[in-house]
Each structure stands twice: as structure tokens, then as C-alpha cells.
């Protein structure tokens, strides 16, 4: 299946008035996770642009450490995803606690980069954009268009880069399973 790049959303959609932002319900982790995944899919190109701008600024100031940090993060993430597919304990951790899994990847990357002395570049160039994405995705309420786009991605009508990353973290399967359960209930 072809991978489609999601469109760049309008700035007033990405950052509307304060009425479209709300604190997530921390007691209902699955609902919060659903909001984050939905927003990551819907605003993925906006997140990529913001992260690219931040990475470019930090990379301009310290190019070697930025390239080193990027390589380490990609290698550690790939290694953890590979290990999680081959070890059941890691697979369960990744599926049940995706945020913890990403934090472990970031901490492992941090310790590897600290051996080379580029920790501040790592913090501001790589981790800070990820933190901003997570905060925005957690606080931004979804609209109808967002929900529709996510359903299309969930049932396989569209395939995007963020969808591939979320599949690697096993965050898409749950939504597809819920959708198929709903469809089978409707048929009955």
C-alpha cells in the first residue's frame, strides 16, 4: 500500500482558541491514549514542520552532535522495536505502556549520547520537540474531521508515516479491533 503524506493543517486549526484545548482525563488512560494517537495522526505534518524547524536551529548551532544524536535515537528505537517483536515481555510492555516504552528509548539514547558529550543538543534538539508534540496531542480536542481521517487510517484506506510509527509501537491495532467489534455488533 502506498504511503501518503498527510496535508499540512491550517495554523488556526493547529492552534485554535483556548476553547479547543482541554486537560485530558488522567483517570481514563485509554481515552487519553486515543486522543494522543488521533492527534498525532491528524496533525503529523504540522508536528514534522515544527520539529524540523527546532532540529534545524539546533543542528545549525551544533551539527556534529545533532547528527550523532539523531543516529543514536534511530538506532536505539529500531533496536527496541526489533527486540519487542522477538521478546514477549518487551512486546507486552510496548503494547500496555507505549509512553513508558518511548521514555525507555529516550533514556537509553540519553545515556549513549552522554558518553559522547552531546547531552544538551539531545535534550533541546530531539527530546524537546517530542515533548511539545506529546503536550499538544494530549491537550488538543479532536474535531469531526480529525475523527474521520483517523477512521480512514485505522481501517487501512490511508497509510501515513505517523501510522507506520504508531504501528511499530502497536498503537493502531487496538483501534482497528474496536472498529471491527463495532461493525460486527451493528451487523447483528
Swiss-Prot record:
Residues 103-117 are annotated as: Required for homodimer formation and heterodimer formation with ARL6IP1. InterPro entries: Prenylated_rab_accept_PRA1. The chain crosses the membrane at residues 36-56, 57-77, 94-114, 115-135. Coiled coil: none annotated. Keywords: Acetylation, Cell membrane, Cytoplasm, Cytoskeleton, Endoplasmic reticulum, Membrane, Transmembrane, Transmembrane helix. One of its GO terms (cellular component) is plasma membrane. It is a multi-pass membrane protein. The keyword Transmembrane applies. One of its GO terms (biological process) is negative regulation of L-glutamate import across plasma membrane. Homodimer. Heterodimer with ARL6IP1. Forms multimers. Interacts with ARL6. Interacts with prenylated RAB1A and RAB3A. Interacts with SLC1A1/EAAC1. Interacts with RTN2 (via first transmembrane domain). Does not interact with VAMP1, VAMP2 or VAMP3. This is PRA1 family protein 3. It comes from Macaca fascicularis (Crab-eating macaque). The lineage of its organism: Eukaryota, Metazoa, Chordata, Craniata, Vertebrata. The gene is ARL6IP5.
